[in-house]
Amino acid sequence: MNCNLGFEKKIISLLNSIDGITESHGTLGLYDIVSKVDSDTEKGIQDIITSTIRKIPEIKSTMTLTRSECEDLFKPAEKLIAAMIGKNSAQAYVVIHTEREKEYDVLRHLSHIPEIKEADVVFGYYDVLCKVEASEYTTLEKVITKGIRKLSHIQTSMTLHIITEQD
């Protein structure tokens, strides 16, 4: 989402206090803030987005990606370890456009990169979304430029670097 300049920290704090929002971060990239919304139902997610997030006056635009959750390549145990490791200082979300019908091939390739803590095929403007974590920025940079962007079937990608100062 994009917001009024200077309101990022306030909005992130507000978003993190909303039931159903599991994390929000400021980013460097095309968008100012990225949030993860979780609910047992699709209607629950829609309500959080349309009735809560989009009603915040300082938020100027939103873009929603919906996870497909069709394949379980990132196992729960790995996610638990990722959560424990999740205090890595360098983090980013990477959104990816793939060649037509190659989303799951890309997802399978991503599952072999240890620094990718979460990834899924998404519905929306992009095809795949992944969260990358590393202990330092240079490692994160190498994973994105030499690991992710070099994979076959990727047409374009956009990186949203998480800004920890706004958390």
Which stretches of residues belong to each language-model region?
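A compositional/biophysical signature of low hydrophobicity enriched in polar/charged and small residues
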Residues: 1-167
